[in-house]
Amino acid sequence: HINKQLSTEVLMHYENSFENHDDNDDGFYDKPKVEQYNLQNRWLWAGEKYIFHGGIGALKEHRNGGQTGHRGNDGAELFRIGLDTERYEAYMKHAFIIDRHKGTNIALMASGSMHMLDAGYGHKTYDVNEKNVYASLVFETNFTKMHNLSAGLSLNHDYLGQTVRMVNDKEASPVRMNEKETVPGIYAQYTFNLDHRLTAMAGIRADHSSVYGTFVTPRLHLKYMPTNILTLRLSAGKGYRTPHALAENNYLLASGRRLVIDDLEQEEAWNYGASAALNIPLL
């Protein structure tokens, strides 16, 4: 704590797995060598009517694996795998408290990140440069102890620059692929709370993707406590996701198989869930 309102923390992590093993004696390392640096700095300002939370982070990692050595053919080239990763990110949240008793506030959130990966699987290569920017504006208030409303706007932008050589031939020319998507959206969420016994939350949001067009996402959550030791939950909702086949599965380049990537549509799914939890105090 610097003073009553301002506090900060610095987090650092270092990892070095410098030893390799081949316990099953198959000529390949059982796990890669990893050297990683991780740094984060967070700040918090908590005032009477204004709260700020922000931070920055950086990560750098080297990961190497592959064959341990030659097996009877010293002239053959060893199969090596190497991944060099760098990631930088920053985020902030500004909260303006209008009425503390009613829980009325407006919050502005923003974040940005850059992620770079240089990967090699033998002579196959995969280099990616990803940039993301996200911002949202949220309003929340309690009409009464039983009724709460949250509504907001959001904007998400993704850029994915990829360069890939999908054949194990160092003379082959890499292929460059760029993907961009901007998604503005709006949402509203209503929560009903009855003496902490029954909680019902219904939400809906609408987004417009520059790639896939407009889509609507509803959801519903129910929580019921008939007794102090039994909790019942039900949930249902719809979800959408933009697939990035190579970014999510680039490890398959280590295989000798031929990879074929079709034009992928936006993923769409309904999700349902139910649970019952029993809490029995022993003492």
Regions found by a protein language model. Name each.
Residues 5-24, 36, 103-122, 149-156, ...:
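Surface-exposed extracellular loop regions of Gram-negative outer-membrane beta-barrel proteins
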